[in-house]
């Protein structure tokens, strides 16, 4: 590098080191935003939640009211999707049965990461009124898929659904990309276990072929003077009938 001899020492220093640390003034500090990739990523996802609506019972009626203009849930950026591959939030509303459980797990597995779950209603969380004597109701959807937000109620109001979405947004804003795969569900709702005893099949397929269906009852047959079928006679009555004959 060849420098002009007519330049002063200060000018030479500026040419050699053109980049210097600038003084941060009050005006400059108000125009600079410092953030991280995690914060930017979480901020972008806060207003772009696309829910997959999984309604199986009466709780879904309240969610249908939320879609209306009175509550306007579009202000949160929620766009209902019909395909799990386009959704990052699934809202389970209603009773989950044993037959429906594999389909729910399959829909959850088809959703891309990161994905979230809101359990809406008492029947989804603990089985509700079906958790006592129903052999087909699942005692809590968290036995099938991890739940991020529990929304109790029978059914919960649309205002409660909005509150659950706000709580989920707060959870998303505090997440990290590196720690997302390491987070696992630790706390679950208490739910009762099955206390039912297995019994033999009641419906054998031969109900119409039974003796009581092919012939009238014994009292009715005696009243109208019809011969009593042998199937309705006891051993003692059969012996008496034989001795008479």
UniProtKB/Swiss-Prot annotation:
Source organism of this protein record: Nostoc punctiforme (strain ATCC 29133 / PCC 73102)
Oligomer status and interactors: NDH-1 can be composed of about 15 different subunits; different subcomplexes with different compositions have been identified which probably have different functions.
Cofactor(s) annotated in UniProt: [4Fe-4S] cluster
Enzyme Commission identifier(s): 7.1.1.-
Protein's recorded name: NAD(P)H-quinone oxidoreductase subunit K
Any single Pfam family the record assigns to this protein: Oxidored_q6
Family: Belongs to the complex I 20 kDa subunit family.
Major subcellular site: membrane
Role: NDH-1 shuttles electrons from an unknown electron donor, via FMN and iron-sulfur (Fe-S) centers, to quinones in the respiratory and/or the photosynthetic chain. The immediate electron acceptor for the enzyme in this species is believed to be plastoquinone. Couples the redox reaction to proton translocation, and thus conserves the redox energy in a proton gradient. Cyanobacterial NDH-1 also plays a role in inorganic carbon-concentration.
Compartment(s): Cellular thylakoid membrane
Enzyme class: translocase
Topology class, membrane: Peripheral membrane protein
Cited SUPFAM superfamilies: HydA/Nqo6-like
Gene Ontology molecular-function annotations: 4 iron, 4 sulfur cluster binding; iron ion binding; NADH dehydrogenase (ubiquinone) activity; quinone binding
UniProt catalytic activity: a plastoquinone + NADH + (n+1) H(+)(in) = a plastoquinol + NAD(+) + n H(+)(out); a plastoquinone + NADPH + (n+1) H(+)(in) = a plastoquinol + NADP(+) + n H(+)(out)
One GO biological process term: photosynthesis, light reaction
CC terms in the record's Gene Ontology section: plasma membrane-derived thylakoid membrane; respiratory chain complex I
Cofactor: binding details: Binds 1 [4Fe-4S] cluster.
InterPro entries, per the entry: NADH_UbQ_OxRdtase-like_20kDa, NADH_UQ_OxRdtase_20Kd_su
The UniProt record lists the keyword Ribosomal protein: no
Keywords recorded for this protein, A-Z: 4Fe-4S, Iron, Iron-sulfur, Membrane, Metal-binding, NAD, NADP, Plastoquinone, Quinone, Thylakoid, Translocase, Transport
Annotated segments matching region Disordered: 210-245
Extent of Basic and acidic residues compositional bias: 236-245
């Amino acid at each position: 590098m060849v420098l002009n001899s007519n330049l002063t020492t200060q000018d030479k220093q500026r040419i050699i080191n053109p980049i210097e640390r600038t003084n941060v003034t009050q005006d400059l500090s108000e125009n600079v935003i410092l953030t991280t990739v995690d914060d930017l990523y979480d901020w972008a996802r806060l207003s772009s939640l696309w829910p997959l609506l999984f309604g199986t019972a009466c709780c879904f009626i309240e969610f249908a009211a939320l879609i209306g203009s009175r509550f306007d849930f579009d202000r949160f950026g929620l766009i209902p999707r019909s395909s799990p591959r386009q959704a990052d939030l699934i809202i389970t509303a209603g009773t989950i049965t044993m037959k429906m459980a594999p389909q729910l797990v399959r829909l959850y597995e088809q959703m891309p990461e990161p994905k979230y779950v809101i359990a809406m209603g008492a029947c989804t969380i603990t089985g509700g009124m079906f958790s006592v004597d129903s052999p087909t109701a699942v005692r809590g959807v968290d036995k099938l898929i991890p739940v991020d937000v529990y929304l109790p109620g029978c059914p919960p109001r649309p205002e409660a659904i909005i509150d659950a979405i706000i709580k989920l947004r707060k959870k998303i804003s505090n997440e990290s990309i590196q720690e997302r795969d390491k987070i696992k569900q630790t706390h679950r709702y208490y739910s009762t276990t099955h206390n039912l005893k297995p019994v033999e099949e009641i419906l054998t397929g031969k109900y119409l072929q039974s003796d009581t269906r092919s012939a009238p009852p014994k009292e009715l047959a005696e009243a109208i003077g019809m011969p009593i079928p042998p199937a309705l006679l006891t051993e003692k009555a059969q012996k008496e009938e034989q001795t008479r004959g």
